[in-house]
């Protein structure tokens, strides 16, 4: 009530209007206002006094942390080209909209943690006056590693994801207690779900559920939560296996000590897009133009339009590439996207020439196209595919038959490869990238 009155200090409200605005009964508002007047926190005209503003001060939001380091691999293929937070939705970049909403709520101390494609995020510092922290471990650890970098900033702090879209501004300048935003998931969900008591305090967390409150969106750490959570974070992060977990996993193990409210929001207000198909349902522009070179590559190769490309599913990453499957015009395909920096140690032109020969000899029946300059490839999808089992003689025999057919074909390319020199060269390049 005090926070509402401060936010709307230029206006005068009746008790009935306050009850409607705050979704409280008229009787409850009457009792609260009587108490506030007795304490001299509001005056007879129901305006906040100087003492009332002082009482609010411990509940003022100090800062916000925006998590933007992850690769968002589920959001293929757009996340292969730009960080998910830089996607434009309804004409605004996700992270820019979030920063503006925080600043409109009076929160100026904002830190953005970057990692994957970090250089594309650096402009935010100059444009919005935010601080940038780089997480160089983004590719091997989970978001707990990001919080470790800013643990000393945790206080009365918003923890935000760069890829949420808030239809209405959910941020406030004063908050009574810490909370995790939740939306009601109709049917099955694989999100983390909050189990709460009658006061909406989260008392347990389960992964996945049905017709339940899913933990989606922003989080607010109050000062008491932050002090305890910092201890938990430092303790848990010492264990190497735990570094691959979400900070929510740490929280769930100490949920009885780390108190947060489950704050309920409408799914029409808090949006999280886990796939291009979901984004298309909210922003129809992506049906026509996804602003993606990858989508353009597919359209040109398969003679289709962007809306024909559906059911995109990330596949397990290879050693040097990232791939996803998709449906297009009644057939299923795989798009292979070259990993960053692989052009330094993989000769894509040589690979493309070999691929074309394998297709010509009917050794590879799936090959559709490969770009020898950029390294991307499109193939037909093979259901129930398996890797070669070197201990299975039937597998080895089939593989050797294919290799024999290739080497006895007489086909040649203009490329050559010395495997021993190649191994030495590969090792040196990995060392130079601190990946060996």
Language-model region placement:
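Conserved beta-loop-beta/alpha segment of the NTase-like Rossmann-fold superfamily
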Residues: 119-192
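Conserved alpha/beta core of the MobA/IspD/sugar-nucleotide pyrophosphorylase nucleotidyltransferase superfamily
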Residues: 47, 51-64, 214-300
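A short, conserved structural fragment
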Residues: 37-46
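Short amphipathic alpha-helical interaction segments
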Residues: 23-35
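Active-site catalytic-loop/activation-segment of kinase and kinase-like phosphoryl-transfer enzymes
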Residues: 277, 283-285, 293-294, 418-436
């Amino acid at each position: 009530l005090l926070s509402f009155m401060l936010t709307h200090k230029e206006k005068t409200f009746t008790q009935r209007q306050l009850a409607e605005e705050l979704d409280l009964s008229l009787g409850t508002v009457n009792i609260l206002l009587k108490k506030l007047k007795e304490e001299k926190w509001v005056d007879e005209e129901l305006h906040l006094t100087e003492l009332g503003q002082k009482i609010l001060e411990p509940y003022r939001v100090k800062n916000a942390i925006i998590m933007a380091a992850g690769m968002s691999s589920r959001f293929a293929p757009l996340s292969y080209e730009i960080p998910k937070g830089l996607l434009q939705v309804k004409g605004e970049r996700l992270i820019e909209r979030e920063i503006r909403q925080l600043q409109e709520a009076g929160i100026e101390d904002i830190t953005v943690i970057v990692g994957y494609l970090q250089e594309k995020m650096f402009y935010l510092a100059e444009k919005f006056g935010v601080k940038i922290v780089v997480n160089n471990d983004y590719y091997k650890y989970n978001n707990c590693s990001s919080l470790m970098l800013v643990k000393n900033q945790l206080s009365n702090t918003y923890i935000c994801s760069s890829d949420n879209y808030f239809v209405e501004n959910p941020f406030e300048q004063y908050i009574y207690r810490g909370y995790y935003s939740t939306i009601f998931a109709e049917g099955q969900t694989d999100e983390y779900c909050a189990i709460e008591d009658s006061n909406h305090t989260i008392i347990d967390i389960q992964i996945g559920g049905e017709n339940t409150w899913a933990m989606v969106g922003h989080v607010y750490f109050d000062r008491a939560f932050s002090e305890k959570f910092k201890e938990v974070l430092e303790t848990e992060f010492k264990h190497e296996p735990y570094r691959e977990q979400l900070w929510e996993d740490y929280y769930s193990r100490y949920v009885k000590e780390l108190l947060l409210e489950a704050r309920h929001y409408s799914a029409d207000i808090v949006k999280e897009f886990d796939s291009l198909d979901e984004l298309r349902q909210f922003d129809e522009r992506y049906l026509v133009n996804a602003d993606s070179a990858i989508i353009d590559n597919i359209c040109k190769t398969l003679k289709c339009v962007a809306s024909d490309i559906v059911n995109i599913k990330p596949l397990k990453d290879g050693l040097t590439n990232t791939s996803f499957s998709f449906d297009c015009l009644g057939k299923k395909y795989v798009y292979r996207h070259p990993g960053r920096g692989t052009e330094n140690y993989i000769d894509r032109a040589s690979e493309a020439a070999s691929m074309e020969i394998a297709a010509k000899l009917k050794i590879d029946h799936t090959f559709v196209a490969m770009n020898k300059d950029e390294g991307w490839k499109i193939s037909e999808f093979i259901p129930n595919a398996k890797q070669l089992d070197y201990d299975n003689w039937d597998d080895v025999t089939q593989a050797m038959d294919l290799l024999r057919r290739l080497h006895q074909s007489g086909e040649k390319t203009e490329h050559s490869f010395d495997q021993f020199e190649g191994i030495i060269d590969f090792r040196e390049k990995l060392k130079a990238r601190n990946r060996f």
